[in-house]
Curated annotation (Swiss-Prot):
Residues the entry annotates as binding substrate: 235, 264, 293, 329, 349-351, 390-393, 429, 456
Record flagged with keyword rRNA processing: no
Organism: Shewanella woodyi (strain ATCC 51908 / MS32)
Keywords attached to this entry: 4Fe-4S, Iron, Iron-sulfur, Lyase, Metal-binding, S-adenosyl-L-methionine, Thiamine biosynthesis, Zinc
Binding site for Zn(2+): 433, 497
Gene3D superfamilies assigned: 6.10.250.620, Radical SAM ThiC family, central domain (3.20.20.540)
Protein's UniProt name: Phosphomethylpyrimidine synthase
GO molecular function: 4 iron, 4 sulfur cluster binding; carbon-carbon lyase activity; zinc ion binding
Amino acid sequence: MSNRRQTRAQAQQFIDTLTPLQHPNSEKVYLTGSREDLRVGMRQILQSDTLVGGTEADPILESNPPLKVYDCAGPYSDPDAEINVRAGLNKFRQSWIEERADTEQLAGVSSGFTQQRLADDGLDHLRFDSLLPPRRAQSGKRVTQLHYARNGIITPEMEYIAIRENMEQAGITDPVLRQKAKGESFGASIEQVITPEFVRQEVARGRAIIPLNINHPEAEPMIIGRNFLVKVNANIGNSAVTSSIEEEVEKLVWSTRWGADTVMDLSTGRYIHETREWIIRNSPVPIGTVPIYQALEKVNGVAEDLSWEVFRDTLVEQAEQGVDYFTIHAGVLLRYVPMTAKRVTGIVSRGGSIMAKWCLSHHSENFLYEHFTEICELCAAYDVSLSLGDGMRPGSIADANDEAQFSELETLGELVKIAWEYDVQTIIEGPGHIPMNLIKENMDKQLALCDEAPFYTLGPQTTDIAPGYDHFTSGIGAAMIAWYGCAMLCYVTPKEHLGLPNKEDVKQGLIAYKIAAHAGDVAKGHPTAQIRDNALSKARFEFRWEDQYNLGLDPETARAYHDESLPQESAKVAHFCSMCGPKFCSMKISQEVRDYAASQEVELQSHASYQAKSASEIETGMAQMSAEFKAKGAELYHETAVVDEELADAEA
């Protein structure tokens, strides 16, 4: 069997046998909101107890609280969920949408292209069968979360998000877990507790979006904004060269397991429409697309043949399928194209290059820009959010922060204000390849030019020297820009610039970017971000190996690395690892020093008191303590009875 067929067969088997996947020692828990059908899922990591004293036969233990963490996997991490990829996920938001009474179910699909696909019997074997007719806004209505927020309405989606962002971590009172360094948020308004009203205010202001198409009721509400947890997007999708529907559905499920907050389907190969249907119906996270890719397929890959009519029909097609956000390259203007002529890498955005070619071939202004108000009207009818694409982003650090890039950014700032006039939720896409010293300028300009609309960046990649490791080179920039205020990071996999990522590449990219996003949250001073770090550090110091693995982003890899060199059962409770061994473990030595100091009643004196002593007094005291230590066998541990006897003698 060829590698391609084998990969597809494995993906098919994955789908056929798909059951909920849980991380070790974790359980799915739900917090209920103000109504019974508002149940917010999250992962709860159970911890073992800490040994604080006693004997081997009669130990004294201190419990460690379970830790709730953000979970993107929806039903795929719930052992009680019944998973049937052919039926799709539960449409749990359907009742919320219907009770607002501002949408209507259509008799059939509106897109001419979709009608053609449905009439083609040759596609029956590829179809997702369990389809409902699409919904759209009633005439004269706007059904976006931005519209509701501006009218003072707190939707169930907003309450859901508030519960999800807090993760009930305010209930953790352990001072060791609650401690955190003072953050630097660069002007962000980060609340100690996220309330539904705060969510509403941020959405109404345009500083955050809730990407939830009314035709994607399976999606769990989430929010993108710099005053919330930093989110991560994963890209999947087939190409003309490789991949299949089965593989893309597998990647979707896999992406949510490893923490993708949203997923973009960037398919450019055959059966784009059918692939997307399977993905949306089985996705618990918002799905984004770049509609120009499919529009180009419809004109056989000839950019010059694109038209507004073809593109508009594509928007309707995808909106009625349930796409939650569109990347639209409406800022690539004709007059900006010559600015890229002297670049090292020219225009590297696929969407940007397509529109640049169309503009030059017709010597006309970008039709996405010319028809932008119509795009907004369409999005407002389905609550499709806009992601204004950066078609002029730099493809090398040599081209960073140039005239073309920032000219487009100015235009995106103009477009976001137009979108807001139509109550369309909008985010701004950013670079790209940017050296570390130029990253903050990007964030500052975006906030100023785009009136604090959420920023969504691809990296940025900080150096161009490491093909095969661009999840590292870009993860560095991603962590920095997340700290400066970027709301969502688009992951980069090890295959960036080299090929279409497989499952393992998707995982590696997501882990790298979850690290970057979390590091940004910690640096900003997010009130609960450091709790997980502290819990893991405490487990590490106490040699609770299993807890150390399970509290991490990738328990399986951590456990495998440890057991690779110390596979014995005894090593799972040992107070050392193979890095330093039993005699040189800094944490073991530190614990022994603590125990010794406590057993000897060593008095910890202030620095000022220490300085007040003469050099000779200090030297004499140190020599005395050294002699006593050696006289007792130079052992850090002593039997309790011996210590008690010595203390009694000292008191006498």
